Amino acid sequence: GAQGQHVQEKAVTLAAARDLKAALERTGRYRVRLTRDGDVYVIHGRRVQIARDAGADLFISLHADAGSDPALRGASVYTLSEQGAGRAVREFTKGDDWQRDLRLPGRDASVDRILLDMTQRATQNRSAQFARVLLTHIEGDNHPLLRRSHRDAGLAVLLAPDVPAVLLEMGFITNPEDERVLSDERARRRLMRSVAEGIDRYFREPAAPVMVAGDIAGG
């Protein structure tokens, strides 16, 4: 991971994840599963699988950005790109039991593929909705945002076809002020409270639920 002047990305992201977990669990409305709770590396595909196995309604990957220009600072959020969506479908349908994994009938591969595409489109829409809400809450707490703060990419942690997901770059660990915020317990917890408030708002907003393919197939 990235290295700041005084702290490492892997340390501040784990601390932030624990802060966010505590903030969400205090509400009594959420069950939170961390993909790691120590100084271990979890491969990207395994992180996605942990979320899917848990039946997650939302997946957030926390990171700290790095850049060659120390003046660069601010948070940004990534959601899955169209190119990444195509990759996700190809990766997901490699296995022999992908239809069973999504509770599809398995009688007609072309129909099942359409249902998978519908599921993924709904998931992408919900991910984008959460990204907008999240950025609003982060900015509202006077935390700086990177220019063009909502971005898309084909990142491996965003590839689940049925779990809305974002990657949050909390700031630039190579910027002294962002590094201070991420390494200072009080400032970091304040940022994570903003994230928790964004999650609350996301789940309160009226929106069509993400239909998994098996639900669509079943009518």
Regions found by a protein language model. Give the residues of each.
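Active-site-adjacent mobile loop/cap segments within catalytic or ligand-binding domains
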Residues: 68, 116-217
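Catalytic-core regions of hydrolytic enzymes
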Residues: 1-108, 121-132, 189, 212-219
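Short, basic/glycine-rich phosphate-binding loops at helix/coil junctions
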Residues: 110-114
